[in-house]
C-alpha cells in the first residue's frame, strides 16, 4: 500500500498546492481531523484554521485555509476554500489591521454584521498565529 496520497488545495483565484503528502491535519466543525493515505472516501466542511501536512519528502508544512469543503475520493484529497496561503504570503500588518476592524465591528453590535465580523476575526487571528509560528 502506498503511504502517500494526492492533496490539492484550490481557491477561486488559484491552485495553492498540488502534490503528494503523507498526512494532513485540518479542522471541521466537530474538531481536528487527521487524514492518512487510503482513507475512506468522505466529504466534510472545514473551518478557518491552520492546516498542517507532511509532504512526500517528510517536510512538515503549514498554511492558513479559510472555511470550505474537503473531499477525499480514491486516495486523492481536494480542499476547496475561499482563501488559503502559506506563511510567506501573509502580510502580518494587514492581518493585524483586519483583526482590529473585526473587533471594532463586534463592539458596534450590528446584528447583521456580527457573524461576518466573528468570521473575519477568526481568519485574522489564524493568519497572525501562522505568521508568528515561522
From Swiss-Prot:
Keywords (A to Z) from UniProt: ATP synthesis, Cell membrane, CF(1), Hydrogen ion transport, Ion transport, Membrane, Transport
Keyword match Transport: yes
The organism's place on the tree of life at top rank: Bacteria
Transport as UniProt keyword: yes
GO MF annotation: an example: ATP binding
Mode of membrane association: Peripheral membrane protein
One Pfam family linked to the record: ATP-synt_DE_N
Compartments (UniProt record): Cell membrane
GO terms under cellular component: plasma membrane; proton-transporting ATP synthase complex
Residues of the signal peptide: none
Role played: Produces ATP from ADP in the presence of a proton gradient across the membrane.
Entry-linked HAMAP family: ATP_synth_epsil_bac (MF_00530)
The family this protein is said to belong to: Belongs to the ATPase epsilon chain family.
Protein name: ATP synthase epsilon chain
Organism: Clostridium botulinum (strain Alaska E43 / Type E3)
Lineage, highest ranks first: Bacteria, Bacillati, Bacillota, Clostridia, Eubacteriales
Gene: atpC
Amino acid at each position: 500500500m502506498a503511504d502517500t496520497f494526492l492533496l490539492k488545495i484550490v481557491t477561486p483565484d488559484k491552485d495553492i498546492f498540488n502534490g503528494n503528502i503523507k498526512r494532513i491535519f485540518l479542522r471541521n466543525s466537530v474538531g481536528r481531523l487527521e487524514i492518512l493515505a487510503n482513507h475512506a472516501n468522505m466529504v466534510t466542511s472545514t473551518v478557518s484554521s491552520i492546516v498542517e501536512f507532511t509532504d512526500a519528502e517528510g517536510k512538515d508544512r503549514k498554511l492558513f485555509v479559510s472555511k470550505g469543503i474537503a473531499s477525499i475520493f480514491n486516495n486523492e484529497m481536494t480542499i476547496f476554500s475561499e482563501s488559503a496561503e502559506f506563511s510567506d504570503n501573509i502580510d502580518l500588518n494587514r492581518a493585524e489591521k483586519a483583526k482590529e476592524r473585526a473587533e471594532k465591528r463586534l463592539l458596534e453590535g450590528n446584528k447583521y454584521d456580527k457573524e461576518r465580523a466573528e468570521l473575519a476575526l477568526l481568519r485574522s487571528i489564524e493568519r497572525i498565529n501562522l505568521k508568528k509560528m515561522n
